[in-house]
């Protein structure tokens, strides 16, 4: 299984319940498509290097994933691009 790290930035003005639902939804997208979520944790609110969609801060969330193929990652990528609550995301393959 290949290991991946996913980092995404959530808009800072989201309510706590909505943030938790968003994180749970995107974790389930990964698991429903065959990936295993090893760790999913929220960093704190951090200042952005530059303004994104009129926001100067964002809530950083990091997910460590193991997957046999990239189907789960492609689905995560596709859905995070169209979700207004996610400002940016990045998927990195970890060399073992």
UniProtKB/Swiss-Prot annotation:
Keywords: Ribonucleoprotein, Ribosomal protein, RNA-binding, rRNA-binding. InterPro entries: Ribosomal_bS6, Ribosomal_bS6_sf, Ribosomal_S6_plastid/chlpt, Transl_elong_EF1B/ribsomal_bS6. It comes from the Bacteria. Pfam families: Ribosomal_S6. One of its GO terms (biological process) is translation. GO terms for molecular function: small ribosomal subunit rRNA binding; structural constituent of ribosome. GO terms for cellular component: cytoplasm; ribonucleoprotein complex; ribosome. Binds together with bS18 to 16S ribosomal RNA. Belongs to the bacterial ribosomal protein bS6 family. NCBIfam families: S6 (TIGR00166). This is Small ribosomal subunit protein bS6. It comes from Streptococcus pneumoniae serotype 4 (strain ATCC BAA-334 / TIGR4). The lineage of its organism: Bacteria, Bacillati, Bacillota, Bacilli, Lactobacillales. The gene is rpsF.
């Amino acid at each position: 299984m290949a290991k991946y790290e996913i980092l995404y930035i959530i808009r800072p003005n989201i309510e706590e319940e909505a943030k938790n639902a968003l994180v749970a939804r995107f974790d389930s997208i990964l698991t429903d498509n065959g990936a295993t979520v090893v760790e999913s944790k929220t960093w704190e609110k951090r200042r952005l290097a530059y303004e994104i969609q009129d926001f100067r801060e964002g809530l950083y969330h990091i997910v460590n994933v193991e997957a046999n193929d990239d189907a789960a990652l492609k689905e995560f990528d596709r859905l995070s691009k169209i979700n207004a609550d996610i400002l940016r995301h990045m998927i990195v393959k970890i060399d073992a």
